[in-house]
Amino acid sequence: MDKVLNREESLQLMDLLGLERSAWGNIPLMRKAYLKKCKEFHPDKGGDEEKMKKMNTLYKKMEDGVKYAHQPDFGGFWDATEIPTYGTDEWEQWWNAFNEENLFCSEEMPSSDDEATADSQHSTPPKKKRKVEDPKDFPSELLSFLSHAVFSNRTLACFAIYTTKEKAALLYKKIMEKYSVTFISRHNSYNHNILFFLTPHRHRVSAINNYAQKLCTFSFLICKGVNKEYLMYSALTRDPFSVIEESLPGGLKEHDFNPEEAEETKQVSWKLVTEYAMETKCDDVLLLLGMYLEFQYSFEMCLKCIKKEQPSHYKYHEKHYANAAIFADSKNQKTICQQAVDTVLAKKRVDSLQLTREQMLTNRFNDLLDRMDIMFGSTGSADIEEWMAGVAWLHCLLPKMDSVVYDFLKCMVYNIPKKRYWLFKGPIDSGKTTLAAALLELCGGKALNVNLPLDRLNFELGVAIDQFLVVFEDVKGTGGESRDLPSGQGINNLDNLRDYLDGSVKVNLEKKHLNKRTQIFPPGIVTMNEYSVPKTLQARFVKQIDFRPKDYLKHCLERSEFLLEKRIIQSGIALLLMLIWYRPVAEFAQSIQSRIVEWKERLDKEFSLSVYQKMKFNVAMGIGVLDWLRNSDDDDEDSQENADKNEDGGEKNMEDSGHETGIDSQSQGSFQAPQSSQSVHDHNQPYHICRGFTCFKKPPTPPPEPET
């Protein structure tokens, strides 16, 4: 260090560094002080520029001198100040030493391993050794035992590492300490080594690989999970492999992996859950979860199975009992149900693409007929008289009601562009929503609220994905005939959805967490109060039915509460019973005609035409539909009072039950009223058929009997 700087420079540098003189030569301490003073003297930090320059110059000179002094040949050079005075004996010695050769003939150079042994001095130099390429994968004999997943989150407890001999020896100790392995062994494999080890806890392959790669900067390393632990270890102990070392003397045995008394863990059958969802057509995750959890209890003492009221339960309880018991303890209940529901929706998507609309409607009718067989069967709780009463009430809602329903079904099946939507318009409590709800259940579909803001409307329209029809319920607008009607933006929104209503082009429908679905928007119904409809929207309706409130229908409902309590008049089954009662068998699809015939025969046996006409008579009179067996004087007085109220307009009630108008530019042919199989009765009789409706002319009241 004394030759690096002279004394004046060294003192000056130590003063600039702020160190004691005794610290001269302590390079780390001087380096730390230098970095600290650089921040202090730097001009950008407000320091002294001259001191900064002087300190940098001296420190750089000192640093270069230290590096030069540590060179191996330092001291083999001479300095001009060290040359003796010319002419003296010292100068002669120095001169002789300066001219002395470093290599003498008596010396021999050690031979190198890389030198050629050829005798000729003109022989070809030796070729460079070729670098051996690193293997790309484990030996082929072991591939069947390994997992080949690359980007998997699966966790394992058994791994294998393929690397060089040197790194394998290092990793053997490092992995044993890092993961507290249960067992580890090192094996020879084609000039390389393989590590096989078991961990007490499960890890991802990527975690093991990342740790091992830190210790193998240049050496190759391949890390994989092991699927077949014992087969892998057994193969590593046989040729062409061999054991170098292992943590357990004697290694592993087969019974270490397959204990004799091990019990097989029973797994939930996802397939059975999916089959149940498909058979019941359940597309609600939570509903499916709740129904399947009910199967975990014994079916022998199940009240639902004893009563046999719910076919979705008692038909499947015994079959799914064992699987549901395992399902109840599963941690993936919702995931299993979600997959089952997705399968149901996928089947529905396939049907919407592959089946015709007529086939889809036929399948819907089959489902309704199955429900009717259960409802009105021996174990069912439904009363067919009440449902036929609902048919009688619905048939009085509009003239030729069965033909209206038949026309609507044809319109939905044909699905002709710009001739796909019906408009139900009328005041409050006129029957619009009742009929729309029944038609919706008859065909299958969804009801949509179009009165929402535009930013929420897209997701509301997404509900229509893969549906047979939709109902835009209670659409609000502006400029209604009555000032009491609330205003809304529903009609304006519908006017902006002309391409949806037309059905000429496919539109994009979206749901949350799902990709957009491009399809023809389904046809359907629009219900509204007496709002004004713009011409651009009116042109999208093939038929408009104007509803009017009718007092006799309202009074009949008040006296027949079961029609509303059991939602009979809003049910598609009531409309299907109406079609079975009124329409000929030939108008139904051929595949269900046999079932229609069976139901026609059953209705003929259980209901005569006179009984049905009594029901319609009671509807027109505004009394209870099933109140035709009245014997008390009070009931006779009530009936007479209702008859007097309707005496002047008995037939008018039926004639004014509603009227329908077709769109001028898009008219649709109407169907003739069905011809009844019964003969036309005389007008003098109390109940008979007259132009498809009941002529309600009561016979003259007999004179009172004289008192005795």
UniProtKB/Swiss-Prot annotation:
Motif (LXCXE motif): 103-107
Residue numbers binding Zn(2+): C302, C305, H313, H317
Motif (Nuclear localization signal): 125-132
Domain SF3 helicase: 400-560
GO biological process: bidirectional double-stranded viral DNA replication; DNA replication; symbiont-mediated perturbation of host cell cycle G1/S transition checkpoint; symbiont-mediated perturbation of host ubiquitin-like protein modification; symbiont-mediated suppression of host innate immune response; symbiont-mediated suppression of host JAK-STAT cascade via inhibition of JAK1 activity; symbiont-mediated suppression of host type I interferon-mediated signaling pathway; viral DNA genome replication
Pfam family, one: T_Ag_DNA_bind
Record's compositionally biased regions (Basic and acidic residues): 642-662
Free-text function comment from the UniProt entry: Isoform large T antigen is a key early protein essential for both driving viral replication and inducing cellular transformation. Plays a role in viral genome replication by driving entry of quiescent cells into the cell cycle and by autoregulating the synthesis of viral early mRNA. Displays highly oncogenic activities by corrupting the host cellular checkpoint mechanisms that guard cell division and the transcription, replication, and repair of DNA. Participates in the modulation of cellular gene expression preceeding viral DNA replication.
Protein name (Swiss-Prot/TrEMBL): Large T antigen
Organism per entry: Simian virus 40 (SV40)
Lineage start: Viruses, Monodnaviria, Shotokuvirae, Cossaviricota, Papovaviricetes
